[in-house]
Regions:
Chain A
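ABC ATPase C-loop
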Residues: 178-179
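Catalytic Walker B motif of ABC-type/P-loop ATPase nucleotide-binding domains
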Residues: 186-190
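Conserved ABC ATPase "signature" region
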Residues: 124, 139-157
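The feature captures the beta-strand-to-loop junction immediately N-terminal to the Walker
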Residues: 60-62
């Protein structure tokens, strides 16, 4: 299992695996200051953010802590005021939009409801960055789409129109679309929110399978800290637009963190496995 | 297992290429039949009286159809080879009007369909986004104030439309545009141009000028001939060709701005480019037929209700349905009132409006594209 070794000033941590070999980061945010045109002052300030290669990183934090904003900056949907984002060591700006879409798949939190499109057609749109203006679909496209549909387990609804699906099935269809993009890095903004438990697990299992089989790097915003603690390899905890802590869940998830960041009193059990048992909301928030 | 999978893959391959559904084929065939029938009715009536048989014989007269010189004269304005009086009346006076109807119908429908996807708005059409009112104002200003420029009317109409849409885009632009801002800006610009139009009427001292102007602003195919076909055919073919090729871009755009960007589309650029194509298409129609109301709004809805929301199908459907409806409406405009001809825009407005309301009542999901 990975461990973090903290420097004395606690500014910069370096992740190593069991043999002490440093793990590369797929995505790095450096000296980021993020704001929206309508906001006064930066919404997110973050000296350094690492999304480790071939691992699942969960971004957690309360509403308005800046998770989505950070994800937007990582996916080039939001231009940082200062700082840079690098993917596999290269600056995001050096990619054309299509080149980037072949490296980095993004699923936004809100997907506009589009009723009259079949699931299969939607998944085929995931091949957009791999096709030219006049290109038809080729064999590689078909393979990627079949694989994505199989991974997401939505073969039986492939011909159904999106408008007739439940929220969970819709989400799986959108995820299949991003999977068909066939990228090494995947950013997902709250893919499990509003889903029933069954579909939450199906979404998470799909992500996990993708990570284990294809070595895809995943950064995912999760609403539920207990779920994130069990599911992710690394946690990034956000609080008031700043990084509160990050590292493997065993180290990050403490009763102190739950009080400071989420404003809840909770019991954290580390044996036999990490478990968060929320008790009640703390009064002073 | 691997074999079974790859077989499944091939089956899917075949399926993919056939986005052309039976409904679409049937719809296009039906539209073609309607266009032909309406066209035949159109050429059979007129001041020079002919029997149906005579008129149709003239239409399908092989000595004209297979005469290269005749086509050269039609399309390039060279001297007409000798032909019978019937042929001249049909081929030179009545058929070109049908062709202009076909061209304007197709371009307006395609233009409306593109605008609806680009703005992701049900109500979008060349109208809403200012193109029509801008063109209408330019025409009116030319007729009333700069009457010397009248020969360049089509060009001026197109310029006016482009200018108005440019203004709309500039107003809506704020580090990027959004569908809602585009439509709001369009409504405002529309209003301003319409006020300007109404203001201009007060400066027209000649009743004839006013009538010409009104015909332009309501849209009319009266008096159109090969001249108009020559003006319109090339830009129409270009814009329709690009629209058909860009159908997949429109499909991706329909997924929403964020998703389209995540998939690697340069959303602003594609949106601007396709809007340009839609303006070109609308300008073609406006240049030869004036501002035919409601058409660009209603036709895409009719097609969407029949063949579904996939733009690959929708575009093809529009290219067929637009001509069918325009030629039919023009038959009504020319022949319904006996002696006097109405502008075709009056007919499309009168039929299109109620039909649109009917669709709205019938379809539960009208709010969604």
């Amino acid at each position: 299992m990975a461990r973090t070794q903290r420097n004395t000033d606690r500014e910069r941590t370096r992740i190593t695996d069991d043999n002490g070999v440093a793990i590369e980061s797929a995505l790095v945010g450096d000296g980021l200051e993020l704001s929206y045109p309508s906001s006064d002052g930066p919404v997110v300030e973050c000296t350094r953010l690492d999304i480790p290669e071939e691992a699942v990183t969960a971004l957690v934090g309360p509403n308005g802590s800046g998770k989505s904003t950070l994800l937007k900056a990582l996916s080039s949907h939001l231009e940082p005021d200062t700082g840079t984002v690098r993917i596999h060591g290269e600056n995001l700006d050096s990619f054309s939009q299509k080149e980037l879409a072949r490296e980095l798949g993004v699923l936004s939190q809100e997907n506009d409801s589009l009723g009259s499109i079949s699931v299969e057609d939607l998944v085929y749109h995931g091949r957009y960055p791999h096709r030219g203006f006049f290109d038809g679909t080729d064999e590689a496209d078909h393979r990627a789409v079949e694989r994505a549909i199989e991974l997401a387990g939505i073969d039986e609804i492939r011909d159904t129109e999106l408008g007739q699906l439940s929220g969970g099935q819709k989400q799986l269809a959108w995820i299949a679309m991003v999977l068909a993009q066939d990228t090494d890095v995947l950013l997902l903004d709250e893919p499990t929110t509003f889903l029933d438990v069954h579909h939450q697990f199906r979404v998470l299992e799909t992500i996990r399978q993708l990570n284990e089989e294809k070595g895809v790097t995943v950064a995912v915003i999760l609403h539920d800290i207990a779920q994130a603690a069990r599911f992710a390899d690394y946690l990034v905890a956000m609080h008031d637009g700043e990084l509160y802590d990050w590292g493997p869940p065993e180290e990050v998830v403490t009763e102190q963190l739950l009080a400071d960041v989420f404003g809840i009193e909770a019991v954290v059990e580390y044996e036999p496995e990490l478990q968060v048992l929320p008790k009640r909301a703390l009064p002073d928030r | 297992m691997a074999e079974a999978e790859s077989v499944g893959g091939y089956a899917a391959t075949e399926q993919r290429d056939s986005w052309v559904t039976g409904t679409l084929v049937l719809f296009c065939l039906a539209s073609t039949v309607v266009t032909v029938v309406a066209g035949l009715i159109q050429v059979s009536f007129g001041e020079y009286s002919m029997t149906f048989l005579q008129a149709w014989k003239a239409v399908f007269n092989p000595t004209v159809i297979f005469d290269l010189n005749a086509w050269v004269s039609f399309l390039f304005g060279t001297e007409r080879p000798d032909m019978s009086t019937n042929s001249i009346v049909v081929w030179n006076l009545r058929l070109p009007r049908v062709f202009v109807g076909i061209i304007t119908g197709a371009t307006l429908a395609v233009s409306g369909a593109i605008f609806q996807a680009v703005t992701r708005n049900e109500l979008a059409s060349p109208f809403i986004l200012g193109v029509s009112s801008g063109a209408g104002f330019a025409v009116l200003a030319t007729l009333v104030v700069f009457s010397g420029l009248a020969p360049f009317l089509p060009l001026i109409a197109a310029l006016g439309g482009t200018l108005a849409f440019g203004v709309v885009y500039a107003i809506a632009w704020k580090g990027g545009t959004s569908p809602v801002r585009l439509v709001l800006a369009g409504v405002i610009v529309n209003m301003v141009f319409q006020s300007l139009q109404q203001g201009l009427f007060f400066f027209a001292d000649d009743l004839g000028v006013v009538q010409t102007a009104i015909a332009w602003i309501t849209g009319s195919l009266t008096g159109t001939g090969w001249e108009e076909v020559r003006i319109a055919i090339l830009p129409a073919l270009i814009s329709i060709g690009i629209a058909l090729a860009g159908a997949r871009q429109l499909n991706v755009l329909m997924l929403g701005e964020n998703t389209a960007r995540s998939l690697g589309m340069r959303v602003e650029r594609v949106r601007f480019f396709l809007s340009g194509v839609a303006i070109l298409a609308a300008s073609v129609a406006i240049a030869v037929a004036g501002v035919v109301s409601f058409f660009g709004l209603v036709v895409p809805h009719i097609v969407r209700n029949t063949v579904g929301g996939d733009y690959r199908r929708l575009m093809v459907g529009c290219v067929f349905a637009g001509p069918a409806l325009m030629v039919t409406a023009d038959v009504g405009a020319r022949l319904a009132m006996g002696g006097t001809q109405m502008p075709v825009g009056v007919v499309t407005g009168l039929i299109g409006g109620p039909y649109f309301l009917y669709l709205m009542r019938k379809q539960q999901s009208m709010g969604e594209l």
